[in-house]
Curated annotation (Swiss-Prot):
It catalyses: XMP + L-glutamine + ATP + H2O = GMP + L-glutamate + AMP + diphosphate + 2 H(+). It comes from Chlamydia caviae (strain ATCC VR-813 / DSM 19441 / 03DC25 / GPIC) (Chlamydophila caviae). The gene is guaA. Homodimer. This is GMP synthase [glutamine-hydrolyzing]. It is an enzyme of class 6 (ligase). Keywords: ATP-binding, Glutamine amidotransferase, GMP biosynthesis, Ligase, Nucleotide-binding, Purine biosynthesis.
Length: 512
């Protein structure tokens, strides 16, 4: 298959870059920066991209590539750190200079990379910069094709070797129109990659892969959450394995309001029988006294595995299926040893090393929008496909600090009110995700002319195309007032409601 290969040097945007390329209907995969040249040549990609990263190329032991890769005749695009690496490998100097962050005016000059953007002499626009180091002089046989005020060498090219470098990130949403055009030029025009990445093809490949991996006799256990990922996975596995799939829904006590009954009803309508296991006592017991978010995630992951192990002995299953997707992997920083860890994901970083079941993750390299598209192909109803994401640890990471039953009930009711109001106002499908967070701090209020000491609820809503970057929506004063009034009046323990106005980055979507 004609494809684009990304060598990951640790950028948190690497998988956003991969998604952008897949949206061009071109297959893209990500490998670590130290992948042997022999393996890269065996893959025989149409093009290579060196990602950004947190290191400086002049640091000792900074990530490097085998320089023979430049003699492979494979077109290469370096992004940020990737551009600096190319420049250094060809004899240029990279220095820590004037940093640039945020929107920056830039000038593009004629280049194959900017085809359709630069008609004649130059094209003036704004892109988002995020760098501390800069290339001082262009390498021999390279030309400068973009400049900004504080970064005279913002992009370079060597047409003869088909080598290109960008000091900025074309994949981030802020510069979407320009960035998408640049990536399209590189992938389709320069690399001439084939458009073979289609969701219908993915469905067939995944079903075939599941059959080959599981074999003809072994059985699979799937822990349903009621979310998009596990719902799509359930139908996919059912199509591949039939009655050799056992679906278990674990009531952790950390679920959304009425979640258990809704999940039972939804999957019954899909022709799937599920076993409901009430393990809430265990989860609250195991979480008692634990305040650290990372530890909570690991405890919840371990508790899930213990429950599944116990169930599996009665069901005679050999595999545990999980709805892990690509963004889960990048959040847990497992795709590259140079990545800065943000948080562990329940499905990937929170699992104990010793697992008594073999792990099956068919959706591991699909993005959320690809999972939704797959769900449509599989015939899932819109009510499941368009549901907001819900974290694997559930409300355990929406109660800050120690998880107690009374705290969970408070945030569960507040969340239900918030979602209900979003649906009433026809806003639910206009935001990408929305939820309530319980803050374990009390503040003074006045209720019925009496002094009251109550908890605080934070409301969080975001708009995002990839869940790697996100912005907060400007919900109206009237809408937020309705939500606040209902929460404070209907939940006696709460006396204050705040609205989170933090983008990602710097904040993550979930508070923990």
């Amino acid at each position: 298959m004609s494809n684009i290969l990304i060598l990951d040097f640790g950028s948190q945007y690497t998988n956003v870059l991969a998604k952008k390329i897949r949206l061009l209907s071109v297959f893209c995969e990500v490998l670590t920066w130290n992948t042997p040249l022999e393996k890269i040549l065996q893959i025989s990609p149409s093009g290579l991209i060196f990602s950004g990263g947190p290191h400086s190329v002049y640091q000792e032991n900074s990530p490097k590539v085998d320089k023979e890769i430049y003699n492979s005749n494979i077109p290469i695009l370096g992004v940020c750190y990737g551009m600096q690496l190319i420049a250094r490998d060809f004899g240029s100097e990279v220095q820590g200079g004037k940093s640039e962050f945020g929107y920056t005016p830039i000038v593009f000059y004629p280049s194959e990379l900017f085809k359709g953007l630069v008609d004649q002499d130059a094209f003036h626009t704004e892109i988002r910069m995020s760098h501390c180091d800069s290339v001082v002089i262009p390498p021999k046989d390279f030309f400068v094709i973009a400049s900004s005020q504080h970064c005279p060498i913002a992009a370079i090219e060597c047409p003869e070797k088909k080598l290109f470098g960008l000091q900025f990130h074309p994949e981030v949403s802020d510069s979407q129109a320009v960035g998408d055009k640049i990536l399209s030029n590189f992938v389709k025009h320069i690399c001439q990659a084939s458009e073979t990445w289609k969701i219908e093809t993915i469905e067939k490949q995944l079903i075939q892969s599941i059959k080959e991996k599981v074999g003809e006799t072994e059985r699979v256990l799937l822990g349903l959450s009621g979310g998009v990922d596990s719902s799509v996975l359930a139908v996919l596995l059912h199509n591949a394995l039939g009655d050799r799939l056992s679906c278990v829904f674990v009531d952790t006590g950390l679920l959304r309001k009425n979640e258990v009954e809704e999940v039972k009803q939804q999957f019954s309508s899909l022709g799937l029988e599920i076993l409901v296991v009430d393990a809430s006592e265990k989860f609250f017991h195991d979480l008692s006294g634990i305040e650290d978010p990372e530890q909570k995630r690991k405890v919840i992951g371990a508790a899930f595995i213990e429950v599944f192990d116990e169930v599996s002995r009665n069901l005679d299953v050999q595999w545990l299926a999980q709805g892990t997707i690509y963004s889960d992997v990048i959040e847990s920083a497992k795709s590259c040893d140079a990545t800065q860890v943000i948080k562990s994901h329940h499905n990937v970083g929170g699992l104990p090393e010793k697992l008594n079941l073999k792990l099956l993750e068919p959706l591991r390299f699909l993005f959320k929008d690809e999972v939704r598209a797959l769900g449509k192909v599989l015939g899932l109803p819109d009510v499941l496909i368009s549901r907001h994401p819900f974290p694997g640890p559930g409300l355990g990471v929406r109660v800050l600090g120690e998880v107690r039953r009374e705290y969970v009930e408070i945030v569960k009711n507040a969340d239900s009110i918030f979602i209900e109001e979003l649906k009433k106002a026809n806003l639910y499908h206009k935001v990408s995700q929305a939820f309530a967070v319980f803050l374990p701090c009390k503040s003074v209020a006045v209720k019925g002319d009496c002094r009251h000491y109550g908890y605080t609820i934070a409301l969080r809503a975001i708009e995002s195309t990839d869940f790697m970057t996100a912005c907060w929506p400007s919900l109206s004063r009237e809408f937020l007032n309705r939500c606040s009034s209902r929460i404070i009046n209907e939940i006696p323990e709460v006396c204050r409601v705040v609205y989170d106005i933090s983008d990602k980055p710097p904040a993550t979507i979930e508070w923990e």
